[in-house]
Structures are given as C-alpha cells and as structure tokens.
Amino acid sequence: MLGSLQFSEACLRTYAHPELLKVAESINGPDFTPFNEALFIKEPGIGAAVSWHQDGVTHWESEDFDEDIHGFNFMAQVYGSTAVNGVWVLPGTHKIGKIDIKKLTKDSGGERLKGCVPIICNPGDVVICNRQLLHGSFPNCGYERRITVNFGFHKRSSVLGVKGGGVHSASQIFNSVVIERRSRVLGYAIEARKQRFPEEESYKYQPFNDTKKIFKWNENSRKDLKDYNLDDLSI
C-alpha cells in the first residue's frame, strides 16, 4: 500500500518518531528529504516472493556515485520478521554499484545466494536498509504474517534538480517547489505525533526552521494529505 501516511495515523506518528528522524539527519544531513512510504503485507501461505533486486534507477552512472546516493528505508516491523517471511540481503553490496544478478545467481547455483542473510526482528524493531543493498524475499511458507511500515529518506543533493525515475510516481523534475510540497508530510506528521505524545520532545526539521513554516494537524490537514505520494521523490 503506497502513500500509507494518508490512511493511518499510527503510521504517520511512527514516521515522525524523533529518534528515527535524528538518524535520518545523521545519514543524509539536516536538510534531508522524504522519499516514499508504504505498508508491506506478507500473509502466511500466500505472500509471494520478491526477486533479488537493488532499488534506485537514477544515479548508478553518476560521477558523484556513493553508497548513500539512492537513500535508505526504515522498516518498522509490526509483528517482527523471520527467515521465512522476512527480507533477505547480501551484506556490503550497497557499496559496489550495479550488480549482475543473473550471473550472481548462476554462480551461487540458485536463488539462495552465497552469503545472503535474513533480517530477523522482534515486534516493534526498526531496520535501516540501504536502497542499493541487494535484497529480496522468498514465498511466505510459514504461519506468521509480516507487516512492515516502510518509509525512506534522501540526501537533498540526490534529488534537487534531478528528473525522477518514474517508478513510485510520474517522472518530473524535482525542483525546490516539488521538494517543499512533498516535505509537508513531515510537518503534519510531527504535529500529529506531538498531539499524541505531548511530553515528548519533537524533532525540529531544519528546512521548516529556516523558512519559519508552521503546520497544524487537524481535519484540513488530513484532506491536504490526499494523494501526497504523487510527488514521491523516486530516484
């Protein structure tokens, strides 16, 4: 389910967790930008496989390529995740560029790639997954469902002035107007969380501080979030 923050206030409040946003700042800088939000639901017995892949379509040949240029995702696990229903990754592959997955699969003798490991979590755990990391999942043949509250962030330099990849939203040039419009979800989320947890110290997002932008969380705010994900900063 894409654009999940417009459908679930629980997801919206999770999105604004101050400790998670501090991590986003430490990785992508204080002017980091949103990427995309989704709910991934993998039911027991019917949850399909997702082939090995690397996320990101835009910067693989960039002169400025580095291991963080396509951003990262937080993966918050509602029920936890296991080797049966969870995501598997091949550690270190986010650092080496685009991978020949067909050759890697052939060299490994099948889809169980040599060196791959599962992401195993307890309920409530949050994983950080680099989007360039080779990852995938197998059919959920077990008895436990997996629900992942997924949301990602970019370095501003990775998206400003860049033409989107057209995967999560229609391709467009991500100018400052688009980025500001897409970032409003952060303002609403922070305010929604503040209403729910008034004693908690809220995260201060630098771009809002610089522009003195003020948000309120109310019924009009909910309406303003409708289809916000059409501006997903998909690279």
Regions found by a protein language model. Name each.
Residues M1-W52, G56-E63:
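Non-heme Fe(II)-dependent double-stranded beta-helix
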Residues P30-E37, A48-V50, H70-A76, N85, ...:
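Generic beta-strand structural signal
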Residues K42-P44, G92-G97, G152-S158:
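Short edge-strand/loop segments of extracellular domains
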Residues A48-Q54, E61-E63, V84-L90, K98-K102, ...:
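A short secondary-structure junction signal
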Residues Q54-V57, K102-G115, G164-Q172:
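Short, surface-exposed loop/helix-turn segments at secondary-structure junctions
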Residues W60-T82, I120-P123, G152-R156:
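Short, conserved beta-strand element in jelly-roll/cupin
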Residues D68, G80-F138:
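Double-stranded beta-helix
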Residues L133-L134, F138-I235:
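Non-heme Fe(II)/2-oxoglutarate
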